[in-house]
């Protein structure tokens, strides 16, 4: 609400006190200063910390701009993405009487954020993540959203681990960007226009079949490299209901391999709007509990020449992404038998990986 004429960092307490004065003053007027019908209302909660939309931004090897966002730039070294509007707030907050609080420039689609915006151009061992990354002021108007900050932080954490692996500084990781991107995807991250090409994933070289499927939900979708709905492309395998004995998805490997892990990505219905709010009215509109689309119970069966050589049971799952540790066993076939979902009438699986 405030901060244009003050130092957002050094004058933090002063800004906070001014905001308290505005908030309680407006509430006093609503409750006591006119015919607003609020005489019997009580103020339930006021935040204690001013929310900083921006303060310091550090310069990296690339400065993300408004043009990059509006033109949906797809960088070769993308490690994060965003899609929020370019959201410009009135500089003087409540004191800008003639302006709307927010001037939001909407656009369709998403943009990517390059790795080069996450490390300092002149401090050789410094990464940034969150609202201090290398963007212009208008670039930050979109990238400042918490979800965007979060996935950038995950990318930086993974990048730091690779710097340790290769004994390099952040700028020196450029030759290993593909490895970083694949690390992000393996942990169920998403990067536009980047598919799973993990050389270690044996599923990519397998043939896939299922006990049933529907049009658009073919078994081969689980190894197409994309683990969520993108535009009109649905991308999962979807069973035609659930038979009494369950539904099976079978991956026939390109030979006999020792398999110790199978990763599965299910449908948690990303299209369902979840609003984190203190509003009781909004909370009452939210779906309570586990997403019904998620698979609940299933078995991962290792087979060699058609004979079972290992089985791992998973019960009560409530997560979208499962990394299932198996007893390392030589096999040439992986059967995953899905027994129950958390309520949905069919099974949906976006991705299967085999390691």
Predicted regions and their residues:
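Short beta-strand elements bearing conserved aromatic residues within extracellular beta-rich modules
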Residues: 298-300
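Disordered, acidic Ser/Thr/Pro-rich linker "stalks" and the adjacent N-terminal cap
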Residues: 190-259, 267-294, 306, 316-320, ...
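Extended hydrophobic-aromatic, low-complexity segments
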Residues: 137-140, 273-274, 346
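Short beta-strand-plus-loop segments that form exposed binding edges in beta-rich domains
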Residues: 337-344
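Flavin (FAD/FMN)-binding glycine-rich loop and adjacent Rossmann-like elements that form
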Residues: 1-200
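Short, conserved beta-strand segments of beta-strand-rich sandwich/propeller modules, principally
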Residues: 333-335
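Generic short beta-strand segments
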Residues: 264-269, 339
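Blade-edge beta-strand/turn elements of extracellular beta-propeller
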Residues: 310-313
